[in-house]
Swiss-Prot record:
Top enzyme category: isomerase
Site residues, Transition state stabilizer: R119
Family assignment from sequence similarity: Belongs to the type II topoisomerase GyrA/ParC subunit family. ParC type 1 subfamily.
MF (Gene Ontology): ATP binding; DNA binding; DNA topoisomerase type II (double strand cut, ATP-hydrolyzing) activity
Name the UniProt record assigns to this protein: DNA topoisomerase 4 subunit A
Organism: Rickettsia typhi (strain ATCC VR-144 / Wilmington)
Subcellular location(s) per record: Cell membrane
Assembly and binders: Heterotetramer composed of ParC and ParE.
Site (Interaction with DNA): K40, H76, H78
Gene3D superfamilies attached to this UniProt entry: 3.30.1360.40, DNA gyrase/topoisomerase IV, subunit A, C-terminal (2.120.10.90), Topoisomerase II, domain 5 (3.90.199.10), Topoisomerase, domain 3 (1.10.268.10)
Principal subcellular localisation of the protein: membrane
PANTHER family recorded: DNA GYRASE/TOPOISOMERASE SUBUNIT A, DNA TOPOISOMERASE 4 SUBUNIT A
Keywords: Cell membrane, DNA-binding, Isomerase, Membrane, Topoisomerase
Higher taxonomy: Bacteria, Pseudomonadati, Pseudomonadota, Alphaproteobacteria, Rickettsiales
Name of the gene this protein is made from: parC
GO BP, sorted A to Z: chromosome segregation; DNA topological change
């Protein structure tokens, strides 16, 4: 028994070396496809095993268990489940744009159902799969030993069509991943033909032929052309894909929405479940139900809540909330012909394929030329035999060593003599001179053509173009499998604004916010608030009647505005939540809470005595962080935000000075500190009231509403100091107690 050898090595170095070996194995032998044939090793071994089993399109099917057994036994020493899953995917028409395997039996569904066990299903190769391995028996590719040195397997497939782009690929390796969507083969062929004639073509030139991905499940790509082109230029990006739908008119003016195509790699059953959950949670109130009427084709029927619902708005809400709109990633990270993985752009991938085809045709031509030369040598011998048949037969019968004598007599090689001696007498007697001459002539013509191809690059590229055109004809846009399935429709998502309130049922509500910042929502108006309980030391501060479709404006003491959808506020008497969980108000106080009304003028004022008017449309915040509107100096606060519903404004400060002036003296601004409303020293502005001058000035003294009709003494210009308020004005210097 051999004695074990122990070495002292650095643990970190040993670990890194082994991890690197594992990473390289994962990248090169498992996860990333080869740019030339678009296959990973497991795909290549599976298809080659099927070729060895003669599972051609015109042959019978064989059990998948037999195929998987051959693959794991001869070529791929891994689990049978992984190999069978690969086989199943290559047969699924909703997974591959051009399926490589023709499956018979249950191979799963777009609902996410699993395929039947391999002992029940059968398979064979498709026509397009045969194109991947066409001429593999003509020394077009290198072979290497299998894992146990018992057989040989191809290093690469000849690949008569660009399978990498046609069927796409995806995989996750160590530290890198790939995600290539499928494309239309007819368009790829157009791009290849153009690239042959214009080797210096760029991505923008190629994109005149390749519009973008072509998914097996169809759908609509809504990205702009410049976004698509940018993704193919860098080799990285993404595409937004939407479901295809149509409006079906029904009786009595009603209608239903029918979805006929869904995004690539979206499971139909999970999509329906997702919509059903949203329905249950009342997140999409414009629809009443969804049902699946699919057979071999997809048909999802969505019923609107009533016929007044705009189908476009209904679908926009579903696109926003569900996988009816999905994002497909693009990461063209592949193993190049030099066995180095890298991200390529669309032109580089096509160029690699063309170089591969050039090499394949060169090797095939060399192989065929050698075969022709060998056959010509044999025909030369057969002609000699035909002309000297009796003499040769006599030598064979009479001489002990006929081989040497025939070589010397007819000046032929040892190999040629072996042909004569290994040919049966009956075959020699049936030789016909004209047949030998015709075959010799035909072979010489073929030899001349092959030699011309090998010597002249232009002739070689003619053959490449001819074979690409042949594939293009076979899978053209006028064929069932070749017709483009995914269409394009530019939708500018940056400017697209969906009115979320259109999806909410309009109901009356009452919003209550306490002094400590706890907010809750009660159903209805004129609600009995006596039963509402607050924490010790807390009490109600704001009570607002609104509707579930309203937007609520929250103004902080630092002049920042926050926007909430009324329907998003917690419902119920016992479900108050802190305002800090809904908006990022921090430790600042709430100055006011208002119901948003479009184009309404609001008056903002700070304790420093400044203020301005702002349009309500300018204060809507799109994020939880809010929007800063009024700039407040340190030590001061925003004291009020009021809707402008009068022609005059009254200001009262700590020095107990009251000033009334026309509201038109205050400018409208979008943001800032504002202008001086009332001038004072060593004091702060405490309160403001907007009213109509004709009605007089009113205030609440804690007992009843007081009204002062004669306000002439308090009138002035904006920025004045003001005078003492009327007798009976509250001592706290506020218009409401």
């Amino acid at each position: 028994m051999k004695e074990a050898k122990i070495e002292n090595i650095d643990f970190g170095n040993a670990l890194s070396e082994r991890y690197l070996a594992y990473a390289l194995s994962t990248i090169m032998s498992r996860s990333l496809p080869d740019v030339r044939d678009g296959l990973k090793p497991v795909h290549r071994r599976l298809l080659y095993a099927m070729l060895q089993l003669r599972l051609e399109p015109n042959s019978g099917y064989k059990k998948c268990a037999r195929v998987v057994g051959d693959v794991i036994g001869k070529y791929h020493p891994h689990g049978d489940v992984a190999v069978y899953d690969t086989l199943v995917r290559l047969a699924q028409h909703f997974s591959l744009r051009y399926p490589l395997i023709d499956g018979q039996g249950n191979f799963g569904s777009i609902d996410g159902d699993n395929a039947a066990a391999m002992r029940y299903t059968e398979s064979r190769m498709t026509e397009i799969c045969m194109l991947l391995m066409k001429d593999i028996d003509k020394d077009t590719v290198d072979f290497r030993s299998t894992y146990d040195d018992s057989d040989l397997e191809p290093v690469i497939m000849p690949a008569s069509f660009p399978n990498l782009l046609a069927n796409g690929s995806e995989g996750i390796a160590v530290g890198m991943a790939t995600n290539i969507p499928p494309h239309n083969l007819h368009e790829l062929c157009d791009a290849l033909l153009y690239l042959i004639d214009n080797p210096q073509a760029g991505v923008n030139d190629i994109m005149n032929f390749i519009k973008g991905p072509d998914f097996p499940t169809g759908g609509i790509i809504i990205d702009q052309t410049k976004v698509i082109n940018a993704a193919y230029t860098t080799g990285r990006g993404s595409f937004r894909v939407r479901s295809r739908w149509e409006k079906e008119e029904l009786s009595y003016g009603t209608y239903q929405i029918v979805v006929t195509e869904i995004p690539y790699q979206v499971q139909k059953s999970k999509l329906i479940e997702q919509i059903a959950i949203l329905l249950k949670d009342k997140k999409i109130p414009l629809i009443s139900s969804i049902r699946d009427e699919s057979t071999d084709i997809i048909r999802l029927v969505i019923e609107p809540r009533d016929r007044s619902c705009d189908p476009q708005i209904v679908m926009e809400s579903l696109f926003k909330l569900t996988n009816l709109e999905s994002r497909i990633q693009l990461n063209m990270n592949v193993i190049g012909s030099n066995n180095v993985p890298r991200v390529m752009n669309i032109v580089e991938i096509l160029q690699e394929f063309l170089v591969h085809r050039q090499n394949i045709i060169t090797r095939r031509s060399t192989y065929l030329l050698n075969k022709i030369k060998q056959r010509l040598e044999i025909l030369k011998v057969l002609k000699i035999v035909y002309l000297n048949l009796d003499e040769i037969i006599e030598i064979i019968r009479r001489e002990d060593e006929p081989k040497t004598i025939i070589m010397e007599r007819f000046k032929i090689s040892e190999i040629q003599v072996e042909v004569i001696l290994n040919t049966r007498l009956r075959a020699l007697q049936k030789l016909e001179e004209h047949a030998i001459i015709d075959e010799h002539s035909n072979l010489q013509k073929q030899q001349a053509i092959l030699e011309k191809i090998l010597k002249n690059h232009k002739e070689l590229w003619k053959i490449v173009k001819k074979e690409i055109k042949s594939v293009q004809t076979q899978f053209g846009l006028n064929t069932i499998i070749g017709a483009r399935r995914t269409s394009f429709e530019e939708v500018d998502l940056t400017n697209q604004v969906i009115d979320i309130t259109a999806f909410i049922t309009k109901e009356p509500i009452t919003i209550i916010c306490s002094k400590m910042g706890w907010i809750r929502l009660l159903k209805g108006h004129n609600t009995d608030l006596s039963t509402i309980k607050y924490k010790e030391g807390d009490a109600e501060k704001f009570i607002i009647e609104a509707y579930t479709t309203d937007k609520i404006l929250i103004i902080s003491s630092k002049g920042r505005f926050f926007t909430l959808l009324a329907d998003n506020i917690s419902k119920g008497k016992g479900t108050a939540v802190s305002i800090k969980l809904l908006v990022d108000i921090g430790n600042n106080d709430i100055t006011n809470i208002l119901v948003y009304k479009p184009y309404q003028l609001l008056l903002l004022a700070s304790s420093i005595g400044k203020g301005f008017l702002v349009n309500s449309n300018e204060v809507i915040a799109q994020t939880k962080a809010g929007k800063q509107i009024m700039n407040i100096p340190e030590g001061y606060a925003c004291i009020t935000c009021l809707p402008v519903n009068g022609n005059s404004i009254a200001c009262i400060n700590e020095s107990r000075r009251l000033l009334i002036f026309n509201i038109n003296e205050i400018p409208e601004m979008k943001k800032g500190q504002g202008v001086v409303l009332q001038r004072f020293k060593n004091a702060k502005l405490l309160d403001i009231k907007i009213f109509n001058k004709e009605d007089g000035l009113s205030w609440n003294d804690g007992k009843k509403i007081q009204l002062e009709k004669n306000i002439v003494a308090f009138l002035g210009k904006r920025g004045s100091a003001g005078t003492l308020p009327p007798i009976g004005f509250p001592k706290n210097n506020r218009f409401s107690s």
